[in-house]
């Protein structure tokens, strides 16, 4: 897909703004991702001053059909994030970092696909669950919660007698 490439020749001095729509087909190329459905807008603001090229990449939208960690129902998650990267052209094969994105001098475009993907994945919530309602109750599937509670094995805490003896010591 060439949809996420910005031609270096199209970048004028000053600020240049590019917008990309991230839909479901975007994630087909990334097989190890648990994100398959999305409606996200990515905005790339390129600021060119002489040879210096600074990129501010912003994403805003919704990731759909993620599974709730508690009840496994599908949920949608809002996502908003921003990152700033310096783009440098080089003749060498250098590995890009979080702060610097290297582009070969022979290339005529910057491919933002991987950067956009990483920004989305790294800004997903760690715990994915239904939002709590105003009264504090969960939006989780009640039938599934009942099944989870029914089949959850409660572990009894067994203590080591050696530690129990130490607990009896009183330190002044």
What name fits each language-model region?
Residues 84-88:
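Short beta-strand edge segments in extracellular beta-sheet folds
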Residues 68-69, 141:
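Cys/His/Pro-rich metal-binding microdomains
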Residues 78-81:
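Short Cys/His-rich "knuckle" micro-motifs
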Residues 75:
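Cys/His-rich microdomains that often coordinate metals
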Residues 1-68:
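A positional/architectural concept
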Residues 1-10, 89-172:
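Charge-rich, low-complexity linker and terminal segments
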């Amino acid at each position: 897909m060439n949809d996420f490439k910005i031609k270096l020749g199209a970048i004028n001095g000053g600020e240049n703004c590019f917008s990309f729509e991230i839909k479901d087909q975007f994630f087909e190329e990334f097989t190890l991702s648990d994100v398959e459905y999305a409606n996200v807008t990515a905005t790339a603001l390129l600021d060119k001053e002489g040879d210096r090229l600074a990129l501010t990449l912003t994403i805003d939208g919704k990731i759909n059909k993620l599974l709730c960690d508690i009840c496994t129902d599908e949920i949608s998650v809002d996502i908003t994030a921003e990152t700033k990267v310096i783009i440098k052209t080089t003749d060498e094969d250098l590995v890009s970092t979080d702060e610097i994105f290297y582009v070969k001098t022979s290339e005529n475009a910057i491919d933002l696909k991987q950067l956009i993907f990483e920004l989305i994945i790294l800004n997903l919530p760690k715990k994915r669950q239904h939002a709590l309602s105003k009264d504090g109750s969960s939006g989780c599937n009640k039938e599934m919660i009942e099944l989870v509670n029914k089949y959850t094995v409660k572990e009894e805490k067994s203590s080591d007698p050696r530690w129990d003896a130490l607990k009896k010591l009183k330190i002044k």
